[in-house]
Amino acid sequence: MAPAVLTAIPNRMSLRSLKWSLLLLSLLSFLVIWYLSLPHYNVIERVNWMYFYEYEPIYRQDFQFTLREHSNCSQQNPFLVILVTSRPSDVKARQAIRVTWGEKKTWWGHEVLTFFLLGQEAEREDKVLALSLEDEHALYGDIIRQDFLDTYNNLTLKTIMAFRWVIEFCPNAKYVMKTDTDVFINTGNLVKYLLNLNHSEKFFTGYPLIENYSYRGFFHKNHISYQEYPFKVFPPYCSGLGYIMSGDLVPKIYEMMGHVKPIKFEDVYVGICLNLLKVDIHIPEDTNLFFLFRIHLDVCQLRRVIAAHGFSSKEIITFWQVMLRNTTCHY
């Protein structure tokens, strides 16, 4: 009996090896076929930003506002307006911001307003969810929504909506910031930073990304096609985690948006518009003001930052409470 058992074991191992070999061969064949089926484009090394420009404003978006803020911002002169991109389902994230960095409306006598940017639910809306969003807006009055689909690829439409809203309904804002729900904002630090600026016109800053390469790989979220963006390098731009601009730039950028076809990445899109307008990005001297990647921050670091990306709603609440403690920092 022993020889039979010994013979069976190698046979099973051989069968298993054969299965793995066939699987790997199939995968390799699929990748080869997929690669050969792709249209091949020559990546353009030298960037010509006029490639994106149309003389007539044929890209002006005409989506309708279906929800708007309760406060009459057009009759106010806010020092800073913070516009936060959000999904309809991000109820907890919006509430976390309302009770932390977006709660206080006045900093050292300067008015700061926070609003949320949404599109329509991409899938068929559950009636309970739709009603809860309407109720949420009725309660807080801080939701701005247009009738385009709320999807990742439509983030640029949200940004265009933000610029249009400022022009039409809040034109007196001295500064405007666009950010996301997973970003921790040290609002007090942000206001101090803006108050200490030497100039307040044609100002644009954030986490600068210079000589950032366009990605053509498998990861869909970061991929951009050659048809949409044929150049190897993106323009200088600020990460969408949080960029800040002076109020005078908002109508200039929005006007340019009507001449530039939207692309997948809203922050890159704004960067293209800035380059066409010949507006330089202000690079902060302190490199610890904006954090693009998720990092561990202690209470003293939190007090120094302006914006840090990659946090849950629960973490934002916890970090805000920690930051407000009477802890002495020696650096």
From Swiss-Prot:
Bilayer-spanning residue ranges: 21-43
UniProt GO BP: lipid metabolic process; oligosaccharide biosynthetic process; protein O-linked glycosylation
Residues linked to a glycan: N72, N154, N198, N212, N326
Any GO MF annotation of the entry: N-acetyl-beta-D-glucosaminide beta-(1,3)-galactosyltransferase activity
Membrane topology: Single-pass type II membrane protein
The organism's place on the tree of life at top rank: Eukaryota
Cytoplasmic side: 1-20
InterPro entries assigned to the protein according to its UniProt record, in alphabetical order: Glyco_trans_31 (IPR002659)
Sorted UniProt keywords: Glycoprotein, Glycosyltransferase, Golgi apparatus, Lipid metabolism, Magnesium, Membrane, Signal-anchor, Transferase, Transmembrane, Transmembrane helix
Chain ranges on the Lumenal side, renumbered to this chain: 44-331
Role: Transfers N-acetylgalactosamine onto globotriaosylceramide. Plays a critical role in preimplantation stage embryonic development.
Family stated for the protein in its record: Belongs to the glycosyltransferase 31 family.
Name listed for the protein in its UniProt record: UDP-GalNAc:beta-1,3-N-acetylgalactosaminyltransferase 1
Source species of the chain: Rattus norvegicus
Gene, per the UniProt record: B3galnt1
